[in-house]
Amino acid sequence: MTPEWLKSAMDGNQKGYEDVVVAEVAYSDDAKDCESYQKGHIPGAIYVGDVEVEDATGSEEGAYNLLSADVIEKNLLSHGITKDTKVVLYGGDISGTARVAYAYIWAGVEDVKIVNGGIDAWEKAGYETETKANEGTEAKDFGTTVPAHPEYWTSIEDAKDKVANDDNFKLVSIRSEEEWLGKTSGYNYMDKAGEPDGAVWGKGAKTAADVADFTNDDG
């Protein structure tokens, strides 16, 4: 969604979104360690670290896998987020922001949006930022069993089985061409490169932050 729509919602002009929760997503464990959040964020925005939903230790064994359902639920409730909360996310790295959005939807949050263009687009639209740290009010009941959408996740074992035995199943890599070809792992802390056996390339962008291949020449 656009910065203009979000500002309208925050001003009370979007029915049903009067109490929207806005969150900046980044890779720091805590808001005080996040340079971008400290520099200036959307007014009222709380801080959410990717470590609240995924294993972000950088280990090759479990890197970026979802945390357990009970941990994710606990972290959501700590921000006052339930299945009925209207959530808007933004962040400097769209990949991390999208993974948090996915985790929220998997858990059961029914309305999750991402600000198109993030804080840069917000500021370009002429809107103010603030440096005051914000925190949500803890909620007690998420409102549904977590995950509400277990079908949005599959294990490595299930994926391998479907690649081998289900002609209607496609395991699609959306990584860069160099990652697809095994020329690089894409991470400076991981040596292993390549793709799962049987995967097809979805013609991902040049980097995780590049969307040029998905837009018209004029943007």
Task: Say what each PLM segment does.
Residues 1-219:
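Cytosolic catalytic domains that perform sulfur/thiol-centered chemistry
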